[in-house]
């Protein structure tokens, strides 16, 4: 059997929309409770985190809105639900910190990325405050100016 190629950074999926819509203040690493077909699909990179968020219920964290597309070669005796709710594994101290922050007005807990940590799949979650429309425009303007500055620095060496 041929070796499967790994993604260079170990990243499976990212939620770029969350970084655009929220001011990210603090990040956590959480484990995921997954079934076998989900792990196989994640190895193939078939996951989307757009519009996914974390809900705290009964002292546990749950990942909502994530989409893991089942492989066509997956087991037929298991009914695969691509958008099922997945339990997140956090330490008690981390859970309490997230609960306290979400209880404050304006804070939301969102999933930023799925990635490999050795042989385990981890989910990077973050506490964030929602951005207003003008904040998003300011961020885009700042990113554009940084890009222009980097381009100017790069081109300066080539002109000589």
UniProtKB/Swiss-Prot annotation:
Localization, per the record, is: Cytoplasm
InterPro entries registered for this protein in UniProt: SmpB, SsrA-bd_prot, SsrA-bd_prot_CS
- Please give the PROSITE patterns that the UniProt record associates with this protein: SSRP
Q: Does the keyword Cytoplasm apply?
A: yes
A GO BP entry: trans-translation
Any one annotated GO CC term = cytosol
Which GO molecular function annotations are given, in alphabetical order?
RNA binding
User: Which Pfam families is this protein grouped with?
Assistant: SmpB (PF01668)
What keyword terms does UniProt attach to this protein? Cytoplasm, RNA-binding
Broad class of the protein's primary localization: cytoplasm
Membrane-spanning ranges: none
| Sequence segments annotated as region (Disordered) | 132-160
Q: Per the record's keyword annotation, is RNA-binding included, yes or no?
A: yes
Q: PANTHER family from the xrefs?
A: SSRA-BINDING PROTEIN (PTHR30308:SF2), TMRNA-BINDING COMPONENT OF TRANS-TRANSLATION TAGGING COMPLEX (PTHR30308)
**Which purpose does this protein serve, as stated in its record?**
Required for rescue of stalled ribosomes mediated by trans-translation. Binds to transfer-messenger RNA (tmRNA), required for stable association of tmRNA with ribosomes. tmRNA and SmpB together mimic tRNA shape, replacing the anticodon stem-loop with SmpB. tmRNA is encoded by the ssrA gene; the 2 termini fold to resemble tRNA(Ala) and it encodes a 'tag peptide', a short internal open reading frame. During trans-translation Ala-aminoacylated tmRNA acts like a tRNA, entering the A-site of stalled ribosomes, displacing the stalled mRNA.
Q: Which family does it belong to?
A: Belongs to the SmpB family.
Designated name of the protein: SsrA-binding protein
Query: Whose protein is this, by species?
Result: Pseudomonas putida (strain ATCC 47054 / DSM 6125 / CFBP 8728 / NCIMB 11950 / KT2440)
Q: Which gene encodes it?
A: smpB
């Amino acid at each position: 059997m041929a070796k499967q190629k790994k993604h260079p950074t170990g990243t499976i999926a990212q939620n770029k929309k969350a970084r655009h819509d929220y001011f990210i203040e603090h990040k956590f690493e959480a484990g995921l409770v997954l079934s076998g077909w989900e792990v196989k699909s994640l190895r193939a990179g078939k996951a989307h985190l757009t519009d996914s968020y974390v809900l705290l219920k009964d002292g546990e964290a749950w990942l909502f809105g994530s989409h893991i597309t089942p492989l066509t070669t997956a087991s037929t005796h298991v009914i695969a639900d691509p958008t099922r709710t997945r339990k997140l594994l956090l330490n008690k101290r981390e859970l309490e910190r997230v609960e306290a922050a979400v209880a404050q007005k304006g804070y939301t807990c969102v999933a930023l990325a799925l990635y490999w940590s050795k042989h385990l799949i981890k989910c990077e979650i973050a506490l964030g405050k929602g951005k207003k429309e003008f904040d998003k425009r300011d961020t885009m303007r700042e990113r554009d100016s940084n890009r222009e500055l980097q381009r100017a620095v790069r081109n300066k060496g080539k002109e000589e």
